[in-house]
């Protein structure tokens, strides 16, 4: 891929018009073969790798020739041969072909991605998951409404192929993609009879399709929104599902209550701020209510005419930040007024003025977290701690470490909220559940466990936040921890919890509109 980038802009026309000959380059299949072996070897033992995994370029070219012919189609998703050895061989070549197809399609996408990175300062785009919370901290307090939308991930194969035709001029190179998409659409495993493009599918092809689909949606959406709203400022944060990010905030970011003065924004010009994490884009708007209604209407029409998708009204919800809360990502987000007393001395006279600023106020969803802990059998539905019976076969150190890991992830992720009193209720549930689990393992009571293990039971576990402040901050900074908001850089560890809670919120909204 680096060789294509070195060619410069003068070869970009050749790269878009003559992609199909790349299918017959042996180096391409060698790269896809090595990538497939790396992925498969990490998921299965080494003794299962035999001589059947040797690559034959002639066989692969024959398979690609069958894909090109419209009257034939290779079986990439369904193995009909009852012979397990033939099944495995067919799956091996199918994965190699899919890897090669993905590599070819990534050529124009990588060129477009590089050009977008070079113009990053102009578009004010951030491409890292660690930037989402500072983005919300800086942009959302100056908005008055939020559009909470969801990207539709069910799309017809032909619509997806037509989006590629806008960037790829070599039509024959899209025939294999069309064959693969239609074959997956007609497979017995796919009950939707449409292409489900989601980032959760652990295949390189569908991950690439998701990134391309989202970038295509956003590139058209940004230009149309900026043109229709006459807005001078359209900042957005887009976070592709990749391992290499274009821009990162590597260190911990601290927002102090005392030093929360921000620049005064102009109230004349409407502003639109766009941020997306995963499948949930959020559009923050500063402007009149008519502008919010226009943006919401435009999003529905945009999906219908550009991608021929009918979106239900509940998929684009509008909220006023001063009255309602938005649930993303794993927080209840709202904006509150923060009064600040300012004293000014001029000509031996003291003037006192009250300055009111808006700041984002993330709320920890205590009740949903307790519901998730009840689902995982740490407590009952009312929040009463119970023993984790499935962990009683582990050692005492493993039990303490597992409970400690859960609490550390929760504390790190939700330390961005000023009001962290609810977290100590979660800590109480986890600590008592840990004690009950140890008591159940040793067939004793909590009192006996505390007496045998002593005070080290709870000092060994649930103390990572104190170690965190003592190692990374001074004593003065640790004393100010209750007045500061801290966004940790290891927040992706808690994503499964935030995503599961977000799914519950989405189901509640869908059930509300289905009634």
From Swiss-Prot:
Q: Does the keyword 4Fe-4S apply?
A: no
The record's subcellular location field reads:
Plastid, Chloroplast
- Give yes or no: UniProt keyword RNA-binding: yes
Gene Ontology cellular component list: chloroplast
Q: Which GO terms describe its biological process?
A: mRNA processing; RNA splicing; tRNA processing
Q: What does the UniProt keyword field contain? A: Chloroplast, mRNA processing, Plastid, RNA-binding, tRNA processing
The Gene Ontology terms for molecular function here are: RNA binding
Instruction: Outline what the protein does.
Output: Usually encoded in the trnK tRNA gene intron. Probably assists in splicing its own and other chloroplast group II introns.
Protein family per UniProt:
Belongs to the intron maturase 2 family. MatK subfamily.
- HAMAP family named in the record: MatK
Recorded protein name is Maturase K
């Amino acid at each position: 891929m680096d060789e294509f980038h070195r060619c410069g802009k003068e070869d970009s026309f050749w790269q878009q018009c003559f992609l199909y000959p790349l299918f017959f380059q042996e180096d391409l299949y060698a790269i896809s073969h090595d990538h497939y072996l790396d992925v498969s070897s990490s998921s299965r033992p080494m003794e299962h790798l035999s001589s059947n995994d040797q690559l034959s370029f002639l066989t692969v070219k024959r398979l690609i020739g069958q894909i090109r012919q419209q009257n034939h189609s290779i079986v990439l998703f369904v193995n009909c041969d009852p012979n397990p050895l033939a099944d495995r061989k067919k799956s091996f070549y199918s994965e190699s072909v899919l890897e090669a197809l993905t590599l070819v399609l990534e050529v124009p996408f990588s060129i477009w991605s590089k050009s977008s990175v070079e113009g990053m300062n102009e578009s004010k785009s951030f491409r890292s998951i660690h930037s989402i919370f500072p983005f919300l901290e800086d942009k959302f307090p100056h908005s008055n409404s939020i559009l909470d939308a969801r990207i539709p991930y069910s799309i017809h194969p032909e619509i997806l192929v037509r989006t590629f035709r806008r960037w790829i001029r070599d039509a024959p190179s899209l025939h294999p993609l069309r064959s693969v998409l239609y074959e997956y659409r007609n497979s017995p495993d796919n009950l939707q009879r449409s292409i489900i493009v989601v980032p959760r599918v652990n295949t390189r092809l569908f991950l690439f399709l998701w990134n391309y689909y989202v970038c295509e949606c956003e590139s058209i959406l940004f230009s149309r929104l900026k043109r229709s709203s006459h807005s001078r400022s359209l900042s957005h944060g887009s976070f592709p599902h990749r391992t290499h990010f274009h821009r990162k905030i590597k260190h911990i970011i601290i927002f102090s209550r005392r030093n929360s003065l921000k620049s005064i924004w102009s109230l004349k010009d409407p502003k639109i701020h766009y941020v997306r994490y995963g499948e949930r884009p959020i559009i923050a708007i500063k402007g009149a209510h008519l502008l919010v209604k226009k943006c919401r209407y435009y999003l529905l029409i945009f999906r219908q005419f550009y991608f021929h998708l009918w979106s239900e009204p509940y998929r684009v919800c509008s909220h006023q930040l001063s009255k309602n809360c938005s649930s993303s990502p794993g927080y209840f987000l709202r904006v509150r007024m923060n009064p600040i007393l300012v004293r000014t001395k001029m000509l031996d006279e003291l003037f006192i003025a009250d300055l009111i600023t808006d700041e984002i106020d993330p709320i920890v969803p205590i009740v949903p977290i307790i519901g998730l802990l009840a689902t995982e059998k740490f407590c009952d539905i009312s929040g009463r701690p119970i023993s984790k019976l499935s962990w009683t076969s582990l050692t005492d150190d493993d039990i303490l470490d597992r409970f400690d890991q859960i609490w550390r992830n929760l504390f790190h992720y939700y330390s961005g909220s000023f009001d962290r009193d609810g977290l100590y209720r979660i800590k109480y549930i986890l600590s008592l559940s840990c004690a009950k689990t140890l008591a159940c393992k040793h067939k004793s009571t909590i009192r006996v466990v505390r007496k045998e293990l002593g005070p080290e039971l709870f000092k060994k576990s649930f103390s990572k936040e104190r170690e965190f402040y003592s190692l990374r901050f001074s004593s003065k900074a640790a004393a100010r921890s209750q007045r500061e908001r801290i966004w940790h850089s290891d927040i992706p560890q808690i994503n499964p919890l935030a995503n599961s809670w977000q799914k519950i919120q989405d189901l509640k909204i869908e059930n509300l509109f289905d009634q």
